[in-house]
Amino acid sequence: MRILIFGGTGFVGAHYARHLLEARPVAQVVLCDKAPLDESRYAPVLVQALRDPRCSFRQLDLRQRIPDDLAEGGVDLIANFAAVHREPGHEAWEYFETNLLGADNVCEFADRIGCKTILFTSSISPYGPSELERDEKSLPVPSTPYGASKLAAEKIHLGWHRGGDDRRLLIVRPGVVFGPGEGGNVTRMIRFLRKGLFVYLGNRGVRKSGIYVKSLSRMFEWGLERLGDPSFCNIRPGAAFFNASFDPPPSVEDYVKAIREVGEFKRPVFNIPFKLIYAISHLFMGIGGIHPVRMRKLVRPNLILPSFLKHLDYDWKWDLRSAMADWKCEKPEDWA
């Protein structure tokens, strides 16, 4: 089996590649991305796994046509994880340029070479902001360029799927993905809690859908294995999608409690009114990642439920606390 991972040296791509190499009898995994793997970012165990002779790197820009020679040896699965996603951080057109052109080029390439299976990671962003719980049956109403571009990219992949009855498509909408080497919001939360700098911004009970990166890799495999089952395919025969999150979505306080317990952080956590922090973010916008949009995201719930997984009695393996413990065990420097 030969697998191409677009966005292969990114956070999700690197962890999925490791999962494939350790759990599947694959002949080759090709990491396709704009830059090679930044080994300093990841745990030694992941870096060592990706040094497997079955794993190789191919530099390319997914906004351009994918060359034919990438298909030499055949392609059994294409995983499309490539995206511009940091929000804020880019102009509106940049999300659409990368996320739509990338989807177009991946689907055109799959059509050209005869690959029958695509795995695509979307996002919960297409659902848009709401105080209400939503799941796979809810209407997406994206409110940001990123969310809109991801929803449009889903439709492009669905258009590819309609091109043949033997095609298989799995679309996964993850919440916040965290774990070893993430370097994002949860990593910052760990760092601030360790230093005693973390404060609640009136958001103690705000729920944030999220998933451990290793859980996400297991979900990919679980879903791909079931695409031949008509009862599993909730879009049409051969195509399915689901939300990827813990059930129920953890609150900010749940994240804090799990991190403090695993990290053995004893410093107290205080609560500061959001209006005060929001005003300060305008004064110091752009310094150290401070931005009013990010401040608003901290107090805005994303109650996206994994109802599809729950209905099928999916085994998450890790809960929030055990995920944090596994992360600390694998990459303790993220916690030091």
Segments from the language model and where they lie:
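N-terminal Rossmann NAD(P)H-binding glycine-rich loop of SDR-like oxidoreductase domains
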Residues: I3-A23
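NAD(P)H-binding glycine-rich loop region in Rossmannoid oxidoreductase-like domains
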Residues: S56-T98
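Glycine-rich NAD(P)-binding loop of the Rossmann-fold in SDR/ketoreductase-type enzymes
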Residues: E94-N105, P140, T144, A148-L151, ...
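Mid/C-terminal beta-alpha module of Rossmann-like enzyme folds, strongest
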Residues: R226-H291, M324-D326, D334-A336
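Substrate-positioning beta->alpha
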Residues: E182-R188, G202-L227, A239-A240
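Conserved Rossmann-fold NAD(P)-dependent oxidoreductase catalytic core, especially the SDR/UDP-sugar
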Residues: N105-P145, D165, L170
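Amphipathic terminal alpha-helices
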Residues: H311, D315-A336
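Conserved beta-loop-beta element that borders a ligand/cofactor-binding pocket
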Residues: K155-P180
